[in-house]
């Protein structure tokens, strides 16, 4: 479910040493399964453990997860990264905004999941997003760009070299992707 790297465990162990005995950590998702989902980590003293919490044991600590957050934390990773600028705790939870779909789910659901969990987080760095409008009978995924992608001069490259390659690699049953956006260049456009 959740992977906590050794560096992160050491970081948490130092913090927990200054807390009430028996205190562990809680990993949670606020607004799970929505575009506004946010992940967090907090202290979890013994009296804050709920009966339906899932306890995950690690070498240096335990983490508690509530039953609502649990499915949205599949494949999550907590790391403690140090570089020239300092150190920081990172929590990556690719399924926080959308629950992972089964491998045998309908193609449209699997494509939508990859767009929301893998593609859109990358586009969000430029203020953009892409939505799946439909999958045609011929096997084309019809997409619509929004935000900073609308009118961006790099949108064709992003569509063909980024999104299409990723989707065709994951879903051989697709024949390609098409953009149905009426692009209008403006201040909102990234490039």
Swiss-Prot record:
Superkingdom to which the source organism belongs: Bacteria
Textual note on the cofactor: Binds 1 [4Fe-4S] cluster per subunit. The cluster is presumably bound at the interface of two monomers.
Gene Ontology annotations of biological process type: iron-sulfur cluster assembly; protein maturation
Binding site for [4Fe-4S] cluster: 149, 152
Swiss-Prot/TrEMBL keywords: 4Fe-4S, Iron, Iron-sulfur, Metal-binding
Cofactor dependency: [4Fe-4S] cluster
GO molecular function, a single term: 4 iron, 4 sulfur cluster binding
Presence of keyword Membrane: no
Entries under Pfam families matching the protein: Fe-S_biosyn, NifU
Family affiliation: Belongs to the NfuA family.
Subunit-structure text: Homodimer.
HAMAP family: Fe_S_biogen_NfuA (MF_01637)
Primary role: Involved in iron-sulfur cluster biogenesis. Binds a 4Fe-4S cluster, can transfer this cluster to apoproteins, and thereby intervenes in the maturation of Fe/S proteins. Could also act as a scaffold/chaperone for damaged Fe/S proteins.
The name this protein goes by in its record: Fe/S biogenesis protein NfuA
Native organism: Edwardsiella ictaluri (strain 93-146)
């Amino acid at each position: 479910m959740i992977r906590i790297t050794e560096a992160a465990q050491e970081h948490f162990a130092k913090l927990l040493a200054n807390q009430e005995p028996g205190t562990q950590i809680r990993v949670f998702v606020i607004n799970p399964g929505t575009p506004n989902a946010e992940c967090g980590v907090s202290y979890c003293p013994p009296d804050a453990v709920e009966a339906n919490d899932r306890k995950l044991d690690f070498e240096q600590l335990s983490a508690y997860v509530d039953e609502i957050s649990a499915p949205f934390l599949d494949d999550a990773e907590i790391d403690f990264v140090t570089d020239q600028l300092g150190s920081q705790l990172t929590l990556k939870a690719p399924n926080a905004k959308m629950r992972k779909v089964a491998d045998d789910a309908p193609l449209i659901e699997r494509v939508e999941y990859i767009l929301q969990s893998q593609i859109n987080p990358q586009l969000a760095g430029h203020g953009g997003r892409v939505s799946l409008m439909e999958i045609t009978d011929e096997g084309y995924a019809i997409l619509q760009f929004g935000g900073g992608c609308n009118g961006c001069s790099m949108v064709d490259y992003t569509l063909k070299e980024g999104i299409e390659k990723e989707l065709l690699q994951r879903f051989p049953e697709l024949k390609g992707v098409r953009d149905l956006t009426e692009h209008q260049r403006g201040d909102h456009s990234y490039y």
